[in-house]
Amino acid sequence: MKVALLMSGGVDSSYCAHLLSSQGYEVIGIYLKLHDKNKKHDIYIANCEQVAAHLHIDFQVLDLREEFKKSVYDTFVSSYKEGKTPNPCAICNPLMKFGLGLQKALELGCDYIATGHYAQIKEVNGIKRIAKAVDESKDQSYFLYALPQEAIDRIIFPLGALLKEDIKKTALELLPFLGTLQTYKESQEICFVEQSYIDILKLHDKVDNEGVVRNSNGKAIGTHKGYMHYTIGKRKGFSVFGSHEPHYVKAINPQNNEIVVGTKEELAIDSIKALNKSLPQAFNGGIYDVKVRYRSTPLKAQIDIQGEFIYAKLLESAYGVAQGQALVLYQEDCVLGGGVITQAQ
């Protein structure tokens, strides 16, 4: 059986190459060139080539920079301009890695596509679903909620049942040269961000632009340094005159360059509206676990699907729910689907 492995040049995907080869798969390594950080590409492509040579597998580079810019990068920038908090990985996965990446794999005659994601594939009532990784501290199933079924049916996640701490140790024991691979210093999980997302936005717009902070009643109570610096739930980086209690961002008004802040109690919401990306009608009316951001604790919610929107009525309040983030539904450890949050109140 032939499998296309999306390689990043790091230890995890390199170890995947070893695992798949040792399991008898014919492996073709593919590096996706997604952004314009050429120094980063040079380092990681060289790493991939070294791994491929060591394991005697084919390797190639797929240049998707133009498609990535249109579908992921530009959406990232425009979302912040609109006062939203985008989730670029959740956009990239269905369109780039498991969209155009899978398309390339099929063109190469591959039966499957594999990645180093920490997630699993589980079969439920004859349907394959994305499921949480055994190592829940590294679980990435949240970012994979929008994958089409035709992609899920062809995915292999070699690391899904393993622990991160064991992987690195075992990988370096089996493939000692992995310890000599170059790395690229970065401080963000977002591949095209070097230091802060603000640095990206500054390339496209005036970000540092002092504005008014208002309370829930509309009264001006302070100042901020520019609305794009803030996300819902943030409690630092703005001033509130004469107040010593914590205030949190509860709304962003791009048109007037204003933010609205309130106490934690005022931040509480219990209903969410999301643009449906992948939740089947079969789950309409049920009560499921939902996550509203990557590291959030799952909450129970009653689900109502109407047209192209998902309405989630939370059974307990949530805090810091931002437009642009993903609403992801789970049943036990399996992902059912989800959408992009458009409203929370």
UniProtKB/Swiss-Prot annotation:
Pfam families in the cross-refs: tRNA_Me_trans, tRNA_Me_trans_C, tRNA_Me_trans_M
Q: Which SUPFAM superfamilies match?
A: Adenine nucleotide alpha hydrolases-like
Question: Which residue positions hold the site described Interaction with tRNA?
Answer: H117, Q325
Question: What's the EC number here?
Answer: 2.8.1.13
- Which InterPro entries does the UniProt record give? MnmA-like, MnmA-like_C, MnmA-like_central, MnmA-like_central_sf, Rossmann-like_a/b/a_fold
The protein's predominant localisation is cytoplasm
Spell out the residue ranges making up region: Interaction with tRNA. Answer: 138-140, 293-294
Q: Which residues form the active site?
A: C92 (nucleophile), C191 (cysteine persulfide intermediate)
Q: What class of enzyme is it?
A: transferase
> What does the entry give for GO biological process?
tRNA wobble position uridine thiolation
Q: Which reactions are catalysed by this chain? A: S-sulfanyl-L-cysteinyl-[protein] + uridine(34) in tRNA + AH2 + ATP = 2-thiouridine(34) in tRNA + L-cysteinyl-[protein] + A + AMP + diphosphate + H(+)
Question: Which GO terms fall under molecular function for this chain's record?
Answer: ATP binding; tRNA binding; tRNA-uridine 2-sulfurtransferase activity
Q: Which residues bind ATP?
A: L6, M7, S8, G9, G10, V11, D12, S13, L32, G116
As for what it does, the entry says: Catalyzes the 2-thiolation of uridine at the wobble position (U34) of tRNA, leading to the formation of s(2)U34.
Database matches in PANTHER family: MITOCHONDRIAL TRNA-SPECIFIC 2-THIOURIDYLASE 1, TRNA 5-METHYLAMINOMETHYL-2-THIOURIDYLATE -METHYLTRANSFERASE
Q: What is the name listed in the Swiss-Prot or TrEMBL entry for this protein?
A: tRNA-specific 2-thiouridylase MnmA
Task: Give the species this sequence originates from.
Answer: Helicobacter hepaticus (strain ATCC 51449 / 3B1)
